[in-house]
């Protein structure tokens, strides 16, 4: 039973007074920054390129205000997340979001104005004013986007239209989370319960096939019923992506999305090529699942139930000890920051009524790299802890070693830091496993994670690319078109006939990531790169571990592929993917041998 917020032990809550001591301090800062933005609006547009000094002054002021806006937003959103029922912090978050929008509108002049400068004048100013070199990579990235930046007036119009462009995804979110009431279903205790998005995954992990089947059919009956509405929101969202790409003179929505993070399209293509080549491994794993479960007619609702009965329990204190022990492999510097996270209350540990579900790592440049958890004492919670700690260590190292302008990192790099930790935890637990049953459970856990992250997210990425291409070619994305396409791709990946699994054709309708604009492929590349890097960290040299820390410290001071190359990964080559699939095959082979021994019985 979840507690009220005030019943949680203080040491298990995050300390947000390290951001602002009081709410009044936050409110005063909000008022001050609003005034500062109003002043900027009156004084700075039209003057960016008056001189080298003007370029430096206006740039530094913009970055300083951005830094303060981020800090305000982080406090408001985290206060809201700890108890979403509190109207005060809902209002704070709305005000902070509005401030972000205002910041975007006020500084809409910056990029179009900057891009009026010639490379010759820019290089001359760089030679004259040493401090401009601090921002050279930022300016270089702007020059790289020059062909895609519009006039100041057009940029301001686009910024103002931001809320309209967000409406398809917001409509989906409200409809899917607030308006839709899912059916009642039976749980393992034969009790009728309300099916929710939150409890669906646990029902799909049930050992009782009847429970799984009923929950699965109940969920997808909803998506079948409202398929035309979901198709319309997704179609409109795809049109927004394609329109924005066209407005900015990109060849496609995918090119626009990847160029925004300076990721070459080749990375996406190399991933898809490797995935298609290794689909027989997934088919082999599905066949093994059939054998272990003793089901000849395996269905999509049989994919998620764990194959092991072993019940790992970790209380939080044990989880902390294990995380510290596992992550000590990175050396003294990393170990010290992990210790600080646990001792200085960076982590909000327990579930409470009204608290946001799930887990994340957050914070801003000027704050601790906070983490939100909802600890339930499972093996997954331990993996979540080291995962979020990976993000937080990435943030802490970046902020300590980079100025604000380069003090963040793209999602493309973020998922590598978190899942490297998960892979090292798996390696450690496998090494420590006492018997075949433990080993069987851990191998199953890792193989399922790989399937769910590398194969499944690539399946989503393939569907996402195809629907954007179809819309651009004039195809109408009706529910019939989307159902047919999704069913076909799902069959290709899982080798389970679409006609035997009719409900799965509606799965596209429930995936929020299809509204994120070519985002999901990064989960697959991230997990594969992390698998490759974890092997280097665990089995490699001190130099390999040092190179990994260099990647964590680099932030966005170079292009993403240059940053991850510091750790030893070439994302345009299939090498890291081949190594990841090789490990998948080795662990799958080991699981097959354990099954031959009857360990699963």
From Swiss-Prot:
GO terms for molecular function: metal ion binding; metalloendopeptidase activity. Keywords: Hydrolase, Metal-binding, Metalloprotease, Protease, Zinc. The keyword Kinase does not apply. SUPFAM superfamilies: Metalloproteases ('zincins'), catalytic domain. Its cofactor is Zn(2+). Zn(2+) binds at residues 387, 391, 394. InterPro entries: OligopepF_N_dom, OligoPept_F_C, Pept_M3A_M3B, Pept_M3A_M3B_dom, Peptidase_M3B. Binds 1 zinc ion. The active site is at residue 388. GO terms for biological process: peptide metabolic process; proteolysis. Its EC number is 3.4.24.-. The keyword Metal-binding applies. Belongs to the peptidase M3 family. NCBIfam families: pepF. Hydrolyzes peptides containing between 7 and 17 amino acids with a rather wide specificity. This is Oligoendopeptidase F homolog. It comes from Lactococcus lactis subsp. lactis (strain IL1403). The gene is pepF.
């Amino acid at each position: 039973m979840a507690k009220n917020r005030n019943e949680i032990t203080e040491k298990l809550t995050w300390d947000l007074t390290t951001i602002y001591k009081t709410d009044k301090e936050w409110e005063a800062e909000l008022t001050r920054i609003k005034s500062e933005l109003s002043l900027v609006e009156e004084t700075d547009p039209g003057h960016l390129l008056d001189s080298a000094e003007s370029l430096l002054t206006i740039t530094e002021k913009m970055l300083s205000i951005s830094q303060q806006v981020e800090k305000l937003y982080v406090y408001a959103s985290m206060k809201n997340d700890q108890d979403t029922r509190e109207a005060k912090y809902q209002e704070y978050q709305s005000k902070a979001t509005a401030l972000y929008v205002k910041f975007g509108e006020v500084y809409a002049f910056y990029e179009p104005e900057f891009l009026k400068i010639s490379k010759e004048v820019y290089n001359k100013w760089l030679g004259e004013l040493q401090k401009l070199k601090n921002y050279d990579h930022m300016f270089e990235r702007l020059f790289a986007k020059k062909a895609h930046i519009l006039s100041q007036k057009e940029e301001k119009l686009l910024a103002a239209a931001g809320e309209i462009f967000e409406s398809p995804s917001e409509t989906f979110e409200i409809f899917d989370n607030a308006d839709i009431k899912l059916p009642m279903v039976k749980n393992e205790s034969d009790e009728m319960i309300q099916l929710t998005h939150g409890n669906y995954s646990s029902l799909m992990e049930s050992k009782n096939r009847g429970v799984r089947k009923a929950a699965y059919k109940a969920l997808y009956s909803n998506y079948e019923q409202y398929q035309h509405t979901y198709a319309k929101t997704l179609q409109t969202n795809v049109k927004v992506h394609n329109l924005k790409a066209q407005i900015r003179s990109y060849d496609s929505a995918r090119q626009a999305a990847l160029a925004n993070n300076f990721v070459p399209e080749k990375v996406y293509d190399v991933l898809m090529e490797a995935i298609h080549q290794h689909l027989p491994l997934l088919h082999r794993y599905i066949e093994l699942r059939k054998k272990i479960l003793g089901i000849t007619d395996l269905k999509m609702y049989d994919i998620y139930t764990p194959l092991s009965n072993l019940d790992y329990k970790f209380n939080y204190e044990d989880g902390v000890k294990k995380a510290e022990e596992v992550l000590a492999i990175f050396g003294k510097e990393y170990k010290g920051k992990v210790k600080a996270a646990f001792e200085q209350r960076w982590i909000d540990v327990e579930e409470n009524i009204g608290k946001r579900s799930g887990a994340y790592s957050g914070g801003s440049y000027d704050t601790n790299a906070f983490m939100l958890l909802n600890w339930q004492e499972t093996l997954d919670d331990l993996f979540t802890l080291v995962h979020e700690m990976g993000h937080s260590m990435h943030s802490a190292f970046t902020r300590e070693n980079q100025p604000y302008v380069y003090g963040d990192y793209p999602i493309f790099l973020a998922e590598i830091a978190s899942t490297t930790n998960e892979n090292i935890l798996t390696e450690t637990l496998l090494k420590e496993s006492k018997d075949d049953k433990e080993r069987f459970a851990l191998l199953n856990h890792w193989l399922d994670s790989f399937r769910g992250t590398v194969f499944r997210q690539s399946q989503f990425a393939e569907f996402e690319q195809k629907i954007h291409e179809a819309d651009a070619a004039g195809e109408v994305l009706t529910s019939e078109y989307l159902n047919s396409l999704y069913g076909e791709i799902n069959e290709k990946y899982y080798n389970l006939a679409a006609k035997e699994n009719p409900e799965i054709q509606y799965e596209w309708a429930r995936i929020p990531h299809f509204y994120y604009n070519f985002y999901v492929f990064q989960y697959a590349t991230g997990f594969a790169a992390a698998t490759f890097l974890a092997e280097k960290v665990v089995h490699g040299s001190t130099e390999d571990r040092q190179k990994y820390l260099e990647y964590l410290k680099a932030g966005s001071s170079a292009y993403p592929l240059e940053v991850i190359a510091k750790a030893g990964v070439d994302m345009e080559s299939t090498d890291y993917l081949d190594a990841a699939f090789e490990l998948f095959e080795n662990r799958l082979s080991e699981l097959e041998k354990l099954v031959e021994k009857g360990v699963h019985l």
